[in-house]
Every structure is written in structure tokens, then in C-alpha cells.
Amino acid sequence: MGAVLKAEANIFRSHPFRPMNQATPKKLRSAPCIGVALLLMATGSIQAAEAPPYSVLLQQSLAMAPTMMVQAANVRAAGADAAQARAWLNPRFDTLAENLGAPSSGGQSQRQNTYSITQPFEIGGKRGARIEVGERNYEAAQARERQLRVNYAAELAVAYATAEAAFGRQALAEENLALANEELTVARALVETGKEATLRTAQAQASVSAAQAIEAAASSDVTSTLARLSALSGATEAYTGISSSLLSAQPAMTPGGTTTDDSPAVRTAEAERNAFDAQVNVERKRWIPEVGITAGVRRYGWSNESGYIVGLTASIPLFDRNRNGIDAAVQRVAAAQARLDTVRLEANAARRSAVSQVAATDKQLAAASQGEQAASEAYRVGRLGYEAGKTPLVELLAVRRALVDARQLTIDARLARVRALAALAQADGRLAFEESR
């Protein structure tokens, strides 16, 4: 019980939707309402249906999400291919029966049986080139996995924050509906006392209907965002709540000296270019003759004696010197280099854009918070004036809409900040909202 109360108190103190340093009437304090809604939604399911804190969910998803498991299998396959590339060529066993059915010579059979083993050898560095290709392909697979991990972390962070924002919008919509119902009650009382025209009741009822529609849409948005988060994280059951806040989380510090080459996309493109470059060496050595050394024994049919045989085999690159194969490999390297140059430019632009977006969202959040404080104060004054019969209902409804819009802007600003920070972490090659690189 103490842990629950402590968690509730923490939400009241630090929830991102609360206007700071502002005294408001009890019915206008949106942050506690939103905090209670989040707490109830988060603690409503203590079982597996509740999404764990983001850091825990990220580590679980990196190990268990189907998307990550696919790439992990690809890395293991590339590692197995690299190990297989080191294998030596297998020897070949041959048996040859000669002079079957041939006429006897002096009453003796002319049959001869030959048994031999041929061991092929890769000369001219063919084996070393093949091993290098396997290693480069393995490094490229690892780079692709690292890029996928970084991209996945950014996507998961945005999905988690989007679900949290949906809960905030739902709590805001429920509070807006409650305020609309209170205004309708006050309007009916004023109409009954003759202080307002009957039209005011219709206007207040229309406001309630609009608030009900907004609340229904917000509830639907919560369901869809939780379904998206569940599918992305690989959960077998849809989550019914979240257990921590990411909208108010402080990001990991960006390490100094980060360059464009630290981008996972650049590293992946560079690793793929290196793999194609290693393949060129393989193609250039493909025409080198295949050499084999043969040793065996020949048994003569007319006696019990045997003779030994030794041989050397080699292919002759007379018609095929693999010129076109070499040209194709060289062109693949050129294409990979062009992709690397393009990715490097895009990564540089993406990082500059992410840095700019982070700075912009910080300013946007500060402005939205100030606007929310002003709108809350305006609604407080307008509500007191309406209850005293000094403020028209139309003006009160407009002020409440402005308050809802201001709180909505605060939620949107916090979500935009998470998106920008996730994009910056992605550009820097870091897991979003994690210290690790």
C-alpha cells in the first residue's frame, strides 16, 4: 500500500501535464486528475498485460521481438558462413575398372582395377580470398543488426511515448467532459432563476456532446496506441497500461566527438562496401587453375601384383578467364561506394536536423507550459465570473476550449520532444533514452 501511495505522490509531483508554480481550484487541477488516470490505468493490470518501464521493455524487446530475432538469426547464419569459408576442400575418391570383357592374352585376363584419391588445392590465394569474403559478410550482418537495434529503440521509444500521450489525452478529455457537465448544471440553474436565456442550456448541452465525442475518440486512440506498442515489442497479449513516464524522462547525454561516421547507417553501408570489395578479389582469382594431386594403386587382373600411380590435374583457363565476372564485381563496389557517399550525406543532414528539432521542441515545450498556465488562470477567472452571473456562457465555453487546446499543446510538445530526442539518438548510433551505444 505504501508503494502505491508513493507512486501516486510521485505522479502528482512530476507529471508533465501539470502547470508549474500555479495555484488553481481543486476542480481545475488537471495534473492530479491526469496522474490518477495514468496510475489507475497503469496499476489496473499487474499481470503481463501491463507494459513494463521503457528501459525494461527495450531490453526485453531487443531479445524477444520477432523483428530482432530475424536479424539475430541472419547474424548467426553469416557467422556460420564465415566459419564454413575456412574449411579445406574435400578429397575425391575414384575407382576405375578397365578392359572389362576384353579377350584374354595367353590365357590371362587383361582386366585392371585402379583406386585413387585426388586432393584439390587452392593456389594463388583463392582460399584466403574466400575467407575474407566470409568475414566481411559477417561484419556487414553485424552492422545491419546494430543499425536495426538503434532504429528499433527509437521506434519503440516513440511508440511508448505515443501511448503515454494517448493516456494523457484521454484523461484530459474526461476532465473536459466533467467540466462541460458542471457548466451544463450551472447553466440550467441560471436559466431556472431567470438569469440566463433558455438558449444557454442548449449551448451547454452541445458542449457536453462535443466533449463526449472527444472522449470517445481519445479512448479509441489509447486502444490503438497500446496495440501498436504491443505488436512492436512482440507481446503475445495487448498491453492495457504503461508503468512509467517517458514524456518527462531526461535523455542520456550525447557523448562528445560524435561524427557522421558513428551513424549506424554509415557503418552498415561501409561494411557492405567492404564486403563487395572483398568479392572482387575472389572474382579475380577465380580463373586461376584448379590443381589436384592424385595418388593410388592399380591391381592387375592376371597377377596378384599391384602398381602405384601418381598424377597431377589442373584446369586450363582457355575459354573463361572470368573477365565479365570481375567487371560485375567492380561495378558492385562502385555502386556500394555511391550508396555509402549518399548515406553519409543523409546521416549528416539527419543529425543536423535532429539537433535543430531538439532545440526547437525545448522552446516549444516551454512556450506550451506558459500558455497552459495562462489558460488555466483565464478559465479560473471566467468560471468564477460565470457562476457570479458576470461572464457570458459563450465566453466561458471559449475559455475552456482554449484551456483544453493549451493542455493538448503541452502533451504534443512533450511527444515532439521525445521524437526529436529519439531521432538524435538514432543519428548518433545510440539506443534511445539509454546510456549504451
Curated annotation (Swiss-Prot):
Signal peptide: 1-48
Keywords, comma-separated and alphabetical: Cadmium, Cadmium resistance, Cobalt, Nickel, Plasmid, Signal, Transport
GO BP of this protein: response to cadmium ion
Pfam families in the record: OEP
Keyword Transport recorded: yes
Function, as annotated: Component of the NCC cation-efflux system that confers resistance to nickel, cobalt and cadmium.
Homology family: Belongs to the outer membrane factor (OMF) (TC 1.B.17) family.
Protein name as catalogued: Nickel-cobalt-cadmium resistance protein NccC
Source organism: Alcaligenes xylosoxydans xylosoxydans
